[in-house]
Amino acid sequence: MPPKSRTAGGARKTRRKEKKNVSHGHAYIKSTFNNTIVSITDPSGAVIAWASSGQVGFKGSRKSTPFAAQLAAEAAARRAQEHGMKKVDVFVKGPGSGRETAIRSLQATGLEVGSISDVTPQAHNGVRPPKRRRV
């Protein structure tokens, strides 16, 4: 009986990440009431780097804090700078508390912010919103 190969059963094959040389791109900040997700793409929309509050190490209600959004934006910006990113246009979506903090931390890590756009979707009387909380 021939020996089993490792890749067939348990271990995963990991593909080497190639360094993309992109100097200008887009930063998408999705800030919800529960989490903040930062994705940095090239101008065509291919994701170069991303980070979220949960991926940075926060759990539960701490993911929705501005500090968690700051660390997520810094992590995504550092990964994008490894690929040569220098300038980004920022698109912010959602009502969360980490919107402004994430933009500021993108600037603080050395990325030049060209423009800031709010692309939060507005309902044209679509689905019924969730009921009001009674605390």
From Swiss-Prot:
List, alphabetically, the NCBIfam families matched. PRK05309.1, uS11_bact
Q: Where is the composition biased (Basic residues)?
A: 12-23
Q: Which family does it belong to?
A: Belongs to the universal ribosomal protein uS11 family.
What does it do?
Located on the platform of the 30S subunit, it bridges several disparate RNA helices of the 16S rRNA. Forms part of the Shine-Dalgarno cleft in the 70S ribosome.
SUPFAM superfamilies on file: Translational machinery components
Q: Which GO terms describe its biological process?
A: translation
Q: Name one GO molecular function term.
A: rRNA binding
One GO cellular component term of this record is: ribosome
**Keywords, in A-Z order:** Ribonucleoprotein, Ribosomal protein, RNA-binding, rRNA-binding
Spell out the residue ranges making up region: Disordered.
1-26
Assembly and interaction partners = Part of the 30S ribosomal subunit. Interacts with proteins S7 and S18. Binds to IF-3.
Top-rank taxon: Bacteria
Keyword Ribosomal protein in record: yes
Q: Which organism is it from?
A: Beutenbergia cavernae (strain ATCC BAA-8 / DSM 12333 / CCUG 43141 / JCM 11478 / NBRC 16432 / NCIMB 13614 / HKI 0122)
Q: What is this protein called?
A: Small ribosomal subunit protein uS11
